[in-house]
Amino acid sequence: MHYSTFSLWDTYRAAHPLYTLLQPTRSVDFIKSMIRQYDYYGYLPIWQLWGQDNYCMIGNHSIPVITDAILKGIPGIDADKAYEAVRNSSTTSHPNSPFEVWEKYGYMPENIQTQSVSITLEQAYDDWCVAQLAKKLGKEEDYEHFMKRSEYYRNLYHPSSGFFRAKNADGKWLEPFDPYQYGANGGNPFTEGNAWQYFWYVPQNIPALIALTGGDKAFTNKLDQFFTTTQQSGELNSNASGFVGQYAHGNEPSHHVAYLYNYGQHRSRCTQRS
């Protein structure tokens, strides 16, 4: 079975991991379809509609989908071919993914690539996924390289504001900074979100995010503030709805945040918020 539509920015976070549990055979067909697109385009799908990639979203989120399935041991996937596709899709530049820039600066500069903070955070996670697949296949040099790239999110952390912020290529922080400023798709450092919503996107290393925040107590306090601060500014994307403070239940970047209470001091608040 071949599939030709992959809304991956929307589905890699929860839908595809669920498919591996409920529909593993179909997940294999998804992945084989993605690899066929790699054979045609030279990189895996970004956001494919009816067989054509329209690049409307960021990230390279076929990678976590493929990595997740292989690490779960789902049979029927050629792991070596999959790794070839994953690695080349993380090194061959394509729309919204200028990897020569990524390697040079260790972040996406906003004056070179818009949506730079969101891309930096999401690509760092994709790189962590590449590293995990490389490790499973015994590719130690690749593992070390992509683990290093998975830490690039640190290069956009601004300690005095306590947020991930945009930099230009000269290393200067983009000013003025408003953590409530909402971005849509392009022309803003954040994709369908703001600095509050993207602060929590370091799924590959939550303990490190807690440390950046100042420890368990500060992390929990910031989570509380996230769910209670109602201020907004800038354009609101039509996908953003169901606000609980800064949490936007109507869009994907916020969906995991309530569960982060489980890493802090007040785990019961996960139940309250979710």
Where are these regions (language model features)?
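Carboxylate/His-rich catalytic cores and anion/metal-binding grooves
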Residues: 21-34, 55-88, 154
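Surface-exposed beta-strand edges and their flanking turn/coil or helix-capping segments
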Residues: 43-46, 59, 178-180
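Active-site core of glycosidic bond-cleaving carbohydrate-active enzymes
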Residues: 5-13, 63, 76-151, 155-274
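A conserved hydrophobic secondary-structure block that centers on an alpha-helix together
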Residues: 1-5, 11-17, 21-47, 119, ...
